[in-house]
């Protein structure tokens, strides 16, 4: 006789299998092409991931890639296994940065980038994006005692951001147009950005608010840091894939849309943004915004520019 926990696990597996079948059904009659044909032939799918983008895509103490993005990505991988008829499909995890993520997708090294990449119209010439799975805003992380409360307070100060990001572009534009005389440090990733901030080399860190919450969580004393500033942009996160590959994009979009339609994505959101997560077992306490709820109610891949 099944115990309640075993029954729940069985139900979850059945729901997941049904979702995969639903995502693959519209494509079942089509011969495989593009990325799916490549994956079937090689029996390998290459997944791009981040190393320190808590809680979306990062590496835990055991070396496993985890996070909200990765949980969704795992569902795509299951659908790819079903569509290609490769239950033993191998997964190759490839760490990516803000600088190399697009080239690695373009040149075929990475089949699907499951990180924290913003869907920008300007990027559509190089890559394609899936249905949006998260929406963030760009703000500042600073010490509670710094006196920084908004972007005008950064005049004459040193600020860190991540190289190759929307935040870097916006910060440099602001600096030039408003003659703020900021010194801007471009970090290669969130780990380097956090160290730059904590060491005092920068007075503030500009990035997406939810990622700044992750940086704060990783600090020795999270209560010493605060997220401030008028949002400078809204960022629609999507999985990145090669352009002109409608078959693969339809599969990825189908998996995400099914997760939203079934409500499964709400449970994943609760897991990663409202409950304790590794590595410190702290909760982000980051409730779902109305903008995100609207996206889940009507899934689409439109950028927010």
Describe the predicted segments one by one:
Residues 2-16:
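Bacterial N-terminal signal peptides that target proteins for export
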Residues 30, 36, 71-79, 152, ...:
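Extended ligand-binding regions for polar small-molecule ligands
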Residues 30-113, 262:
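Extracytoplasmic small-molecule ligand-binding "clamshell" domains
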Residues 36, 65, 116, 123-133, ...:
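A structural signal for short loop-to-beta-strand junctions that line the ligand-binding cleft
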Residues 46-55, 65-82, 118, 136-194, ...:
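Bilobed "Venus flytrap"/periplasmic-binding protein-like clamshell domains
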Residues 51, 134-145, 209-210, 217-256, ...:
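Periplasmic-binding protein-like
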Residues 74, 78, 85-153, 292-303:
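Acidic, polar ligand-binding/catalytic clefts
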Residues 99-100, 114-125, 170-177, 191, ...:
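A ligand-binding cleft/hinge motif common to bilobed small-molecule-binding domains
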